[in-house]
Amino acid sequence: MLSPERLALPDYEYLAQRHVLTYMEDAVCQLLENREDISQYGIARFFTEYFNSVCQGTHILFREFSFVQATPHNRVSFLRAFWRCFRTVGKNGDLLTMKEYHCLLQLLCPDFPLELTQKAARIVLMDDAMDCLMSFSDFLFAFQIQFYYSEFLDSVAAIYENLLSGKNPNTVIVPTSSSGQHRQRPALGEAGMLEGVEASLFYQCLENLCDRHKYSCPPPALVKEALSNVQRLTFYGFLMALSKHHGINQALGALPDKGDLMHDPAMDEELERLLAQVPGLVNSVTASPEASCLPSRTPPRVGSPWRPLHHSRKVDGESDGSTEETDESET
């Protein structure tokens, strides 16, 4: 049944809001590229299974990064897939480096950019070296904020730099790839980085940014709540506050609450069913549980992003940012 919000929108606005044209274009491109294979079971079936995979969130698996980040739904689907595929890392209490987490991301998206992984790791590690170990929950919640709100955070980084240098915070921000957090970190590492900026003024700038930003932004009321207990803050302190805010995680809707991060009964049941179908595999996995968690050092090369959808596997995908949690195993 259609929701009241859907009925209140004109058709063209609803189609734009849901990025339907993006998925139609992608479906047609895949249809044309694989028409010989698809002709064996029919075009209607292909479109049915394609849009079923979009609804289930499996359509982003093994796709190019430009498609993975193309829509908010794609980003949520990728976050959920990453969590569901690799939460065993957290259950086993394994600690991995930034490069190892990047290898895991490349298993789902072969051309996933290293820069995004580095930015997410910096939220957790702060001033620590980039080769330090991180818990799965720490990295996951930081990665969620950095990946989903990537364009917004680039603009926030430029605003923070202007405030820190005393420039007019109302200047129109046009962020570029060279002005984001990764390049900005050394420039903000002086005394000003330690002192930060006034939280109330920073929030006013963010509120104005959210009003005019065409990309996804955290709900302003939740951002205000996250900053309510501080008078001054640093840029990475702000990112850490976002990553561990319960309400922002709920509003984004990709990951479960912190206490439920390692629990996914439906996925466990599906994995047990699949493992039971492979002779000899269950015993080997039981004997060496950590083997399934090790990241591949060489990401797979995918010749074509399309996979016959009726044969595709069904896969969907904590952070307090503290040094204590990063340095010890999950329970």
From Swiss-Prot:
CDD domains in the record: DD_C11orf49 (cd22959)
Phosphoserine: residues carrying this PTM: 319
Record field: compositional bias (Acidic residues): 318-331
Compartments where found: Cytoplasm, Cytoskeleton, Microtubule organizing center, Centrosome, Centriolar satellite; Cytoplasm, Cytoskeleton
Chain spans, region Required for interaction with TPGS2: 112-331
Species whose genome carries this gene: Pongo abelii (Sumatran orangutan)
Family the UniProt entry places it in: Belongs to the CSTPP1 family.
Function: Regulator of the tubulin polyglutamylase complex (TPGC) that controls cytoskeletal organization, nuclear shape, and cilium disassembly by balancing microtubule and actin assembly. Regulates the assembly and stability of the TPGC and thereby modulates polyglutamylation of the microtubule, which antagonizes MAP4 binding.
InterPro entries: CSTPP1
Region annotation (Disordered) ranges: 288-331
GO cellular component term, pick one: microtubule
Keywords, in A-Z order: Cytoplasm, Cytoskeleton, Microtubule, Phosphoprotein
Region listing for Required for interaction with PCM1, in residue ranges: 1-111
Protein name per Swiss-Prot or TrEMBL: Centriolar satellite-associated tubulin polyglutamylase complex regulator 1
Superkingdom field: Eukaryota
Region listing for Required for interaction with TPGS1, LRRC49, and TTLL1, in residue ranges: 1-225
Subunit record text: Interacts with PCM1. Interacts with TTLL1, TPGS1, TPGS2 and LRRC49; the interactions link CSTPP1 to the complex TPGC. Binds to alpha-tubulin.
UniProt keyword Repeat present: no
